[in-house]
């Protein structure tokens, strides 16, 4: 069930959902606007010949901080990681989804590539996967609205929420844009085996 503005306010007032800092003026009919922080993680294309999700590639990205009062320039075709200014904390029976802002989408800015879902139990800054699909550079001003969080109540509390010992929870408590940690639990299936259990041709 998607939470309305009054439901979101009730969850915030009860301390079950938390945004830090929280500005009541960011509340929308069924979401809360979030702002972009001043930190960005750029990809260094000269350190590795390829990107491999199975490998630890610590020098694949580098962290930069936008100077006070200056925007970060996202060039056409460029992909960078950013993060929400707000730290988001969810209980075990509420999940969230990050959606982009329509006005920014109409300028060619994509707020997230795939990872818009936020598990119940998560606490941290939400990493943004920012892409410029326009033909001109886009200025990203730290503190500007970058997206909106929608909240969903689960049919029952998660038995093993994000952050519990049952899961790796690689991004719990993350601060700022956090590079991929896919190598920590990388798995792949032998796809040469058919449904009948015989090796494929």
Swiss-Prot record:
Residues at the site labelled Important for bifunctional activity: 116-117
Domain of life: Bacteria
Residues annotated to bind dCTP: 101-106, 119, 127-129, 148, 162, 174
Keyword field: Hydrolase, Nucleotide metabolism, Nucleotide-binding
Pathway(s) the chain acts in: Pyrimidine metabolism; dUMP biosynthesis; dUMP from dCTP: step 1/1
MF terms (GO), sorted A to Z: dCTP deaminase (dUMP-forming) activity; dCTP deaminase activity; nucleotide binding
Known role: Bifunctional enzyme that catalyzes both the deamination of dCTP to dUTP and the hydrolysis of dUTP to dUMP without releasing the toxic dUTP intermediate.
Family: Belongs to the dCTP deaminase family.
Classification via HAMAP family: dCTP_deaminase
Name by which UniProt lists this protein: dCTP deaminase, dUMP-forming
Organism of derivation: Clavibacter sepedonicus (Clavibacter michiganensis subsp. sepedonicus)
Gene name of the record: dcd
């Amino acid at each position: 069930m998607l939470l309305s503005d009054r439901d979101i306010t009730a969850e915030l007032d009860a301390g079950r959902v938390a945004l830090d800092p929280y500005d009541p003026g960011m509340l929308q009919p069924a979401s809360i606007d979030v702002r972009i922080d001043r930190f960005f993680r750029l990809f260094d294309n000269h350190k590795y010949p390829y990107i491999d999700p199975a490998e630890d590639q610590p020098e694949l990205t580098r962290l930069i901080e936008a100077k006070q009062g200056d925007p970060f320039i996202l060039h056409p075709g460029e992909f960078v990681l950013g993060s929400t200014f707000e730290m988001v904390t969810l209980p075990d029976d509420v999940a969230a989804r990050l959606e982009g802002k329509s006005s920014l989408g109409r300028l060619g800015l994509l707020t997230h590539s795939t990872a818009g879902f936020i598990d119940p139990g998560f606490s941290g800054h939400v990493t943004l996967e920012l892409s410029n699909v326009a033909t001109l550079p886009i200025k990203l001003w730290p503190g500007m609205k970058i997206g909106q969080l929608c909240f969903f109540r689960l049919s029952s509390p998660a038995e093993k929420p994000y952050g519990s010992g049952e899961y790796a929870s690689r991004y719990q408590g993350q601060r700022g844009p956090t590079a991929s940690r896919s190598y920590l639990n990388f798995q792949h299936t032998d796809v040469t085996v058919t449904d009948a259990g015989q090796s494929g041709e």
